[in-house]
């Protein structure tokens, strides 16, 4: 099980350790001893039950908590299960109260978020709507912008950064992909914007992407060669020529899940800053160069471009 559906319908990564910690706290609160081994065993049982009953769909947080209750009772820990049930009820009330307060602040234009510079500004639904419409362009008849905004309100909180708001917006749109394929395209656009922000800086200009791609692509290849992470022959390619051959528009061929998998698993990342270092087209070209590296030096760029054309246009899928 890799994902779970949150209470507002958005999708989040499933974290098994949270089940273990929730049960541990319930045992500690009732002063009933247990062991790490027993907690791990019960956690594994909960996960197995969920995977059996949700083979093709995503379980909700409530489903996960229901199975925790059942396992605790089945194991005979009735006092612990009772505490866990009360805990769930009390925290539901707390969440509802907090959500009410956030919604009131939004209505009063009093909810503060932080810009990249650290400056506090009021969260503006109108500003988010205007920004979102840039990504919805072309799918206006298929995407419910007002519903997305209504769900986003349950994700924002006091002191949230503008980057976190963008990520939350992406997650809300992602959770709606099952409604219409258009949501996958919009979510991919939102994710692509974050990737570009990581690679080129948060203030990148969309009308300068060709130049920026060429510059950063050459820098990345040379850096990897210098660090010993790439074959030295990679720096012998005409990097400026290959960088300028990148077809930026092909980034929009991606659906959300494909782009998310590529960016999180295969694109280079700065381990310290936790920032993505290359765009999808840069990755395709880097792979194409690797495939062409054994060619005669005079043929390498030509062959690399041929491989890139196949990869970038999804001809091989």
For the regions a language model picked out, list residue spans one by one.
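Extended catalytic cores of very large enzyme megasubunits
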Residues: 1-317
């Amino acid at each position: 099980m890799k994902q779970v559906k949150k209470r507002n319908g958005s999708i989040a990564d499933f974290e098994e350790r949270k089940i273990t910690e929730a049960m541990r706290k319930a045992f500690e609160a009732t002063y009933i001893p247990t062991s790490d081994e027993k907690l791990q065993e019960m956690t594994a049982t909960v996960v197995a039950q969920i995977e059996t009953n949700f083979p093709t769909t995503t379980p909700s947080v409530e489903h996960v908590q229901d199975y925790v209750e059942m396992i605790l009772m089945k194991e005979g820990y009735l006092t612990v299960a009772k505490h866990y049930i009360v805990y769930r009820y009390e925290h539901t009330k707390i969440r509802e109260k907090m959500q009410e307060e956030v919604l009131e602040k939004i209505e009063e234009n009093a909810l503060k978020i932080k810009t990249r510079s650290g400056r506090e500004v009021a969260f503006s639904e109108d500003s988010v709507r205007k920004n979102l419409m840039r990504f919805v362009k072309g799918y206006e008849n298929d995407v419910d912008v007002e519903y997305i905004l209504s769900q986003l309100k349950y994700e924002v909180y006091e002191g949230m950064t503008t980057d976190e708001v963008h990520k939350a917006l992406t997650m809300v749109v992602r959770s709606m992909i099952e409604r219409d394929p258009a949501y996958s395209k919009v979510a991919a656009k939102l994710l692509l914007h974050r990737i570009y922000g990581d690679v080129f800086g948060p203030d990148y200009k969309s009308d300068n992407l060709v130049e920026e791609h060429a510059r950063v692509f050459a820098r990345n290849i040379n850096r990897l060669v210098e660090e010993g992470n790439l074959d030295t022959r990679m720096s012998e390619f005409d990097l400026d020529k290959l960088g300028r051959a990148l077809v930026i528009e092909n980034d929009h061929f991606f659906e959300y899940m494909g782009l998310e998998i590529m960016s999180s698993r295969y694109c280079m990342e700065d381990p310290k800053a936790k920032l993505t270092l290359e765009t999808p087209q840069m990755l395709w070209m880097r792979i194409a160069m690797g495939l062409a590296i054994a060619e005669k030096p005079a043929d390498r760029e030509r062959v690399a471009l041929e491989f890139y054309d196949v990869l970038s246009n999804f001809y091989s899928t």
